[in-house]
Amino acid sequence: MAGGGETARHYIGTGRKLGMDESMLDDLGLRAARLNAELLVGGLGDAAYPTVPEDMNQVAEAFTTGKVVVVGGFHPGHSTNAVAALIAERVHANLFVNATDVDGVYTSDPNKNPRAKKLDRVTTSQLKKMFGNGQMHAGTYELLDLLAVNIIERSKIRTVILKCDPSAIRKAIQGELIGTLVVV
């Protein structure tokens, strides 16, 4: 699952200055995520499924090919984290890895608070308290949003949140405890 990243934040910020409503801003973010997904497909070459799926049925079909499936979001208003959790649930994945810009879940934003403590394990209930404030604006999703946490909880999928680094992802896939383990 590719997120929109800086590209999305740039377009959303510009759109907000132009007076676009939140649904239009969500759509800009989704388009940026899909554009990033197209770049990833190109970078992966023959290892990747050749197109970016646009709905859950296309994802399920693409997974049957054995190729790497890169997705960039489906619906405005749904974070890429929530869609990624839905995909993990749909394909019955045994591990959901959320690779992000920090190396796990912290007691507060480590980019803003140098005293923030990294948590090795966190429950979905704790995550709901941390990220479930109910406020949602385009391009401002926290580490996880409430919908993503609820999907992780209902599917009981093993979830690890870690730094977006190939060696960290490899370690998580191999079963090494790295980042933060989400406990249902």
Task: Name each region found by the language model.
Residues 2-184:
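C-terminal catalytic "cap/lid" subdomain
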